[in-house]
Amino acid sequence: MKKFVAVLSAAAMMTSLAACGYTADTANTAASSAETTASAAESTADTAAADSYKVAIVQQLDHASLDEIRVAIEKELDAKAAEKGITIEYKDFNGQNDATTLNQIGTQVVADGYDAIIPIATLAAQCMTTAAESTKTPVIYAAISDPAAADLTDIDYVTGTSDALNTQSIMDMMFAVQPDIQTVGLLYSNSEANSTTPIAEAKAYLDAKGIAYVEKTGNTNDEIMTAASSMVGQVDAVFTPTDNVVMAAAAAVSETLTKGGIPFYTGADSFVTAGAFATCGVNYTELGTYTADMALDILETGVVPAYHVMDGGIITVNTETAAALGIDYSAFNDLAGQVVEATTAE
């Protein structure tokens, strides 16, 4: 565009100068010189553009897991910018778990010409993918448990990181320390794509063992709290996958279940630092860092790779919750290469 404008300016200059007695040769020389200058300016602009990127970070809603990922992304972008001597401008957006708001953010981000979009969590990723369809702006999502189920695969401008849950590992943990379980509670949001596959896997696991289960769902904090409270006295343990809706109420849910003597097994370590008993999942700081690296590599190379599944073999236990429940979790040492002890965050 800059070159086109410069050439038009040179042509206008030729017409004006011809009226002042310039010959065609003189005019051609002037046009050639102007075009050369325009090419040099364009080259300089391209170089400057390659050294500067604008990135939109779109968080689905506020809660500990997604906050941890966002902070890790920002830190890594800052570190890589300093290391490479480039400028990476990023701006945070928050959809408050509302599809309309997220769609508006997507429209704004694309219109503002961001070079890449990093959505955190499934609904944010779906909305950003739709918004970027016409421009093919790279979308590098973070923490999508099942990209295929979320319809985020086989799209040439979309990739990212998956925190796919190993549901069997969490179920194995449950029965390792509570071998006499009779009934398991399954607490989740039926609007969360992240929960669909692991809940189905949990049911299949429990059916195979002949263990009963009680399902409770909700789509707001109040509904989740009501569901959790109703499980007290009905179940011996509760399982929640990487469910963003439940995570938003994790502290209150954990407190309610612990007071009721019910261990709360979850899909992410951020639940555990909110008071849940234990998890076997990914490290979200590592996931955020990897996502940022993917985004920068795509910006620099233009190559969009397949999505990456993070290693989730880390067991995290809340020692305060374990003590309150009177549970000996030493059996976890036989199930994972690493057992991390944590306490409830203030």
What are these regions (language model features)?
Residues 55, 73, 163-206, 306-324:
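An alpha-beta-alpha
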Residues 127, 131-167, 266-278, 343:
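Flexible loop/hinge segments that line or gate small-molecule binding clefts
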Residues 97-115, 127-130, 223-236:
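Short, well-structured alpha-helical segments in soluble
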Residues 56-58, 110-122, 140, 184-187, ...:
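Periplasmic-binding protein-like
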Residues 49-75, 80, 91-100, 191, ...:
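Extracytoplasmic "Venus flytrap"
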Residues 147-153, 159-182, 282-302:
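Hydrophobic alpha-helical segments within soluble ligand-binding/sensing domains
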Residues 297-346:
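Hinge/cleft segment of the Venus flytrap/periplasmic-binding protein
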